[in-house]
């Protein structure tokens, strides 16, 4: 038997399924695909924007490639923030980190200690950065 101290279900809990059906039957307005309002722009600008979108997408080829500490410093490119790299935590430093994906970093990068409200800085990969 039920305990007398248990609270009975509320009206909203009893009508949960009906509320869901009513919500989806009302066909709610969802966010548009483009969050920017439509603008008239030249075909050059729109094609350049499409090129930028395709080149700034995350690199999916290196996901989970940091096995046993080797080649564990690959990141996914889109979410790398280069300001305030203070490394205040030692989670995953020096080891592979086991696929720890914090803040867009995959493989063995681990937590780099980037503030959540730091501005997003895009960095173009050049040969001098690799050396």
Swiss-Prot record:
Q: Where in the cell?
A: Nucleus; Cytoplasm, Perinuclear region
Protein name in UniProt: Period circadian protein
Q: What does this protein do?
A: Essential for biological clock functions. Determines the period length of circadian and ultradian rhythms; an increase in PER dosage leads to shortened circadian rhythms and a decrease leads to lengthened circadian rhythms. Essential for the circadian rhythmicity of locomotor activity, eclosion behavior, and for the rhythmic component of the male courtship song that originates in the thoracic nervous system. The biological cycle depends on the rhythmic formation and nuclear localization of the TIM-PER complex. Light induces the degradation of TIM, which promotes elimination of PER.
Task: Locate the compositionally biased regions of type Gly residues.
Answer: 94-109
Q: Where is the composition biased (Low complexity)?
A: 71-93
Q: Where is this region: Disordered?
A: 29-109
Question: What keywords were assigned to this record?
Answer: Biological rhythms, Cytoplasm, Nucleus, Phosphoprotein, Repeat
Q: Which organism is it from?
A: Zaprionus tuberculatus
A Gene Ontology CC term for this entry? perinuclear region of cytoplasm
- Describe, as the record does, how this protein assembles with itself and its partners: Forms a heterodimer with timeless (TIM); the complex then translocates into the nucleus.
Keyword match Nucleus: yes
Q: Does the keyword Repeat apply?
A: yes
Instruction: Tell me a GO biological process for this protein.
Output: rhythmic process
Q: How is it modified after translation?
A: Phosphorylated with a circadian rhythmicity, probably by the double-time protein (dbt). Phosphorylation could be implicated in the stability of per monomer and in the formation of heterodimer per-tim.
């Amino acid at each position: 038997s039920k305990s007398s101290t248990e609270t009975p279900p509320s009206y909203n809990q009893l009508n949960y399924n009906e509320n869901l059906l009513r919500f989806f039957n009302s066909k709610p307005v969802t966010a548009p695909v483009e969050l920017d309002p439509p603008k008239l722009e030249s075909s050059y600008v729109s094609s350049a924007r499409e090129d930028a979108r395709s080149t700034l997408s995350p690199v999916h080829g290196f996901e989970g490639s940091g096995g046993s500490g080797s080649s564990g410093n690959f990141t996914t490119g889109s979410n790398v923030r280069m300001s305030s790299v203070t490394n205040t935590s030692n989670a995953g430093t020096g080891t592979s980190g086991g696929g720890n994906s914090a803040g867009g970093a995959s493989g063995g990068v681990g937590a780099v200690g980037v503030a959540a409200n730091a501005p997003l800085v895009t960095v173009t990969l050049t040969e001098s950065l690799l050396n």
